Structures are given as C-alpha cells and as structure tokens.
C-alpha cells in the first residue's frame, strides 16, 4: 500500500515482509517485470551509475550484500543477486540491503529537503 501511496495506484505490487533478528538493516528480495526483455549486464551497469547504489554481485566469489556486512553504518543501498527471472525473459530478480535508520529515514529526509531547496520550491 505504501508503494501505491508514493508512486502510482496502478503499479502491481505483491510484497511480503519477513522479520529476522538483526540489529539494523533491511533486506528485500525484489522481482520485477518489464515490458521488454531485460539485458542483465545493462541492468547492472544502469544500477551502478546511480549515486548511492552499490552493486555487489559476483556469483563466482559468492559475493552479495548482507545485512551483517552492508546493512549498517553506510548511506548506500546495496544490490546483488541480479539475475533474470526463471519464468519470463522480461523479469528480473534482485537482492537489496540498506541501513534502514540512515537510508530509510534520516538520509531520505535530508535528500528530499536538498532536492526541494535545489528546485527552489
């Protein structure tokens, strides 16, 4: 329901929340469907270009973001396990980790204020 309030009522979202015993940090498994087929390397490159997003995705080294390593004490959002969905060529799976205290609350408020000041609202 939050996604509909923030973005658009027509976005199809099927969220599931799971609480696990970690001190800080949120992690999400995200499934996305697009209109066209997705090139995984292009998706990784696009994510890497965004300020505040760090891609950690090395299947050979079994390297991906975790709440323990990446979910606290930093402003970045960490994305890994980027792969095509098994059922559709136009789907994508991601694993996302962030410090919910910093990125989820405090930093987002500051970034919104900076954007408002920058746009002279």
Regions found by a protein language model. Name each.
Residues 1-93:
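C-terminal substrate-binding/catalytic lobe of Rossmann-fold NAD(P)-dependent oxidoreductases
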